[in-house]
Amino acid sequence: MAFMRSKPSLGSLARVAFRWCGPGVGLVSYSQEPYLVKAVQGKSKPRSPHLTSPQCSPEHRPRRFRPPSASGRTAFSSAPRPKADVMGVADGVGGWRDRGIDARALLPGSDRCFVHAQKPTFDARNPRQLLSECYGEMKRKWKPILGSSTACVVAFNRSESALYTANLGDSGYVVIRNGSVLDRSEEQTHFFNMPFQLTVPPPDSNREMWFCDDPSEAVATRLLLQPDDLVLVATDGLFDNMPEQMLLEMLSKVQGVHEQKAIQEAVNRVVERAGALSINPIYKSPFCLRALENNVPYGGGGKPDDITVVLASVAMTPVQYRGGFQ
């Protein structure tokens, strides 16, 4: 019988070494623990007057918009906790603007996700609950925050070396291993370019008028990670303008790299490239191709949109423990 050797998971890679340090010092143990090296970058949708919107009605193409200073605000990345790393993005749906409502007001809910992730009760194995808590908080406000937003949250549980995900709408995540896509979220839409969304409608309106999806509808997954894996979380502004193969090529130089500066430079390049493609009038973007597949009139080119990306590399760090032997 032949046995195939596969690359072990982070859990099996964690090693403990012991060293006797002499009387009065005792036994010193060393172990390896996984963690994420993270970087964030954002770019706002261009406001150039010569840019034209795709030929879709507002009902079939809700626009996304935020002021230039707010693009990075849509991403949150919690400070590393003892047991988990959390990161994610939220993308306000801009179709509300036609009704006099600024959907940007809903985006601070992503900041609340950061707060909830810091609580001792936070369960890294259930990021969907994180969305539920933030959504419930927004609905309970004395003055409700009106609007809607897509969201993607991932939590890296260190003890299991597992990535737990919760994705609602057309934002999403990609996990890259050895230059190939290991796993990728699938967008949730009611129909073309109408994503699932967490909505807080006007209190005096008929709820049936709106797409009011629930956090429980977020797709949840679990995936074991290995050292050098890359985890990317982004708004649809990236995926609508950059094909998968181009993304893989741009990130190939940082596969296995754990320096924060290099990760930051890589995510900067990805966002800048996607932004340039979004305003290229002759570029056949992924969004353009999907529009044609769905028989939606589209003039061609990229899709001008806000772009927010969080990129992380899985690394191992040695941790030292001392015993008190005499």
UniProtKB/Swiss-Prot annotation:
| Residues that, per the record, bind Mn(2+) 1 | D91, G92
Q: Which residue intervals make up region (Disordered)?
A: 40-83
**Enzyme Commission number(s):** 3.1.3.16
**Pfam families membership:** SpoIIE
- Which cofactors is this protein said to need? Mg(2+); Mn(2+)
- The residue ranges of the PPM-type phosphatase domain are 64-314
List ligand-binding residues for Mn(2+) 2: D91, D236
* GO molecular-function term, one example from the UniProt record: metal ion binding
Name its GO BP terms in alphabetical order: dephosphorylation
Question: Mind telling me what this protein is named?
Answer: Protein phosphatase PTC7 homolog fig
Species, as recorded = Drosophila persimilis
